Amino acid sequence: VPEPNYGDQLQPKGIPGVKAEASPRLRYQEVSGQFADGEQYTLLKPELYFDELNYGELHKDVQTSVRVAPVMIGLGLLEAIPEADILQQADPDDSNGDGISGRPNRVWDVLKQETVPGRFGWKANQPTVRQQSEGAFHGDLGITTTLFPEQGCTAAQQDCLNAPDGGKPEISAEIMEKVTFYASTLAVPARRDMDDADVKQGELLFNRAGCTSCHTAEFTTGSSTDFPELAGQVIRPYTDLLLHDMGEGLADG
């Protein structure tokens, strides 16, 4: 649910006549503990707070978390993974008792007007490369698109609502097609040092520790109407495209 005054994404930058929403800040809390073998550790836990809230206070129940830009390579290959192959790995109740309880994130596909499994974003909150790209133009840059034609201004932001815009949409469908093509076909770099002894040992330990229970090592892409060159490829993305409960220390809403 969007925050009433600030929406669902905080904007720390403004334009002439429109103030930035706020200035996000980080401070760190020292957290101590010990591993199961008794070894002591000290970690720095980041805490997010905000200065210069220009459109009122945040709602008392607001949930906040930080994000960095995701990697852009191989997105079309991830979109070409058959939905059935993703759902086959879901085990939300850990029925097989392996300690892994991945589940798909069901999200709204604006183009199809239906709920589908998400694939993109840090929490699989976008279903397609196109919607992820248009969402970035809209949410990150404030540029309206075919899928998101309305400005992201809240009722509290009259300066934003009154500001001139570049039309509806501000970015054409033709340009978005080119952006989607680029984002979908940007190649994955070739694997490096695969015969190095340390790399082989790391791969062995990765598998032995059970990391591939979540970080699925291999998929075969299905058909791709838009980009047939992506079809039928064996890929190694090391993701299952599912959501996992990482525990209280890593959960951020």
Positions of predicted regions on the chain:
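Periplasmic c-type cytochrome electron-transfer domains
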Residues: 1-253
